[in-house]
Structures are given as C-alpha cells and as structure tokens.
Amino acid sequence: MILSTTPTLEGKTIREYRGIVVGEAILGANVFKDLFAGIRDIIGGRSGAYEKELARAREIAFDELKERAAALGANAVVGIDIDYEVVGQSGSMLMVSISGTAVLV
C-alpha cells in the first residue's frame, strides 16, 4: 500500500478514485495518568513515554486507514492528513485521526 501526503504520486497514474478513508485511535485517560506518573522520563522537554504512546496511536490509525483502503480495492492513499485532537471531559483523551483518498494506481 502506497501512502502519500501529496495529491498525486510521481511516476504513477491514478486510474481510479475509490473514496475517502479514515483511521482513528484514541488514547484514554489511563494512558495520560501513566504518562504523568512517568514524568521523570522528561529529558530536555520531551517525554519518551508520551512519544511512544503517540507513535502507537499513529500506527493503529495508519493500520486502520490501510485496511479501509484495501477493502475499497485501492492500492494507495493520497492526500493524507494527520490530526491530533484533545477530546473528552477536561481533555482526558487524545485522538489521532488520519484521512486521505483511496486510489488505484
């Protein structure tokens, strides 16, 4: 599966547009509790534990995006956009949302 943030793929011709696809992952409040408990991981203003959880959420969202594109018969996703949103009561959860257009090249 080819993934790209650009609307076209250099050297490839988009033969068919299959539709918009989305992948999402939400980190719950317990993750943030664990992250803040591990505040000692912060070195130089960065939290290794927090970054690891964000990477895991991104991976889950990308996997979901690819599964949905494949279900539409696509072999690529173009125009990918990644958004991070704080959601839930008093910002207790973080949502990673990835969207793009499933295409056949």
Curated annotation (Swiss-Prot):
What are the coiled-coil residue ranges? none
Which InterPro entries does this entry report, sorted A to Z? Answer: UPF0145_dom_sf, UPF0145_YbjQ-like
Matching entries from Pfam families are given as: YbjQ_1 (PF01906)
The record's family statement is: Belongs to the UPF0145 family.
Q: Which NCBIfam families match?
A: PRK02877.1
Please give the name of this protein. UPF0145 protein AHA_2580
Show the taxonomic lineage: Bacteria, Pseudomonadati, Pseudomonadota, Gammaproteobacteria, Aeromonadales
